[in-house]
Regions:
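Active-site-adjacent helical/loop segments in soluble small-molecule enzymes
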Residues: 13
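Short amphipathic alpha-helix with an adjacent loop that forms part of the alpha/beta core around
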Residues: 36-54
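Cysteine-nucleophile active-site neighborhood
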Residues: 54-127
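Catalytic beta-strand/loop cores that center a nucleophilic Ser/Cys/Thr
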Residues: 129-183
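Acyltransferase
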Residues: 196-216
Length: 216
């Protein structure tokens, strides 16, 4: 599988690239200053991919600031949704999915380098890629669908989603931590799956690769 990886100038980028390659992906990295014409060409399937019925996967990385200030991130995210390119947005990339669908990203309080136990929603419990990562609640815990331990490094986020996005998990103060698009092959993670503070990260990335390539 080929991944077109948009680097939003974050210190975690190559940890994430290494995680993807460890899952068997060929990863081509582009900075968010790359011209859109180069990126759209990279996202076109090769002849071999066409013959196999495959498309490359777009991953948009974490990064500093607001997604609307991150080079071509917003334009590329909107293009990927329109063209139904399988897309995984992580942290800043997740926020770009929210904004591209008409939602708003706003300050939610700094949570840099913190492990958090996030609650899975009913939709998350029904989302196959999350299933192997969910820890079942113990008796008396207020987590009817289970929870996941994740690494959070962000100060912006979203507590409400536009209609076409579905919350899969949220923090205890209702900041959305994972989403999927209702009709396009796109998933967003506000947390960092590549961090050692997200124990199920490698399992989740493998499951998302399978899901997104099948949905394309």
């Amino acid at each position: 599988m080929r991944v077109v990886f948009l680097d939003n100038r974050d210190s975690f980028v190559y940890n994430l690239v290494d995680l993807c390659t460890s899952r068997g992906a060929q990863v081509d990295v582009y900075r968010n200053t790359t011209p859109m014409s180069v990126l759209t060409a990279a996202l076109e399937p090769t002849e071999a991919e066409k013959a196999a019925g495959q498309r490359p996967l777009l991953i948009t990385s974490p990064g500093p600031g607001h997604p609307r200030e991150a080079g071509c991130l917003m334009e590329l995210t909107a293009y990927a949704l329109e063209q139904r390119i399988p897309t995984l947005g992580i942290c800043l990339g997740y926020q770009a999915l929210v904004e591209a669908c008409g939602g708003q990203v706003a300050p939610v309080g700094p949570t840099h380098g913190r492990t958090d136990r996030v609650l899975v929603t009913k939709a998350g419990a029904e989302f196959a890629p999350l299933a192997p990562c969910v820890i079942a609640p113990r008796s008396g815990e207020q987590a009817p669908y289970g929870w996941i331990d994740v690494a959070r490094y962000h100060s912006l986020g979203s507590r409400e989603l536009p209609a076409q996005l579905v919350s899969l998990a949220h923090s205890r103060d209702d900041v959305v931590m994972a989403l999927r698009h209702a009709s396009a092959p796109a998933v967003g993670l506000q947390f960092h799956p590549e961090s050692i503070l997200t124990p199920a990260g490698p399992t989740l990335i493998s499951a998302l690769f399978t899901f997104l390539t099948q949905e394309a």
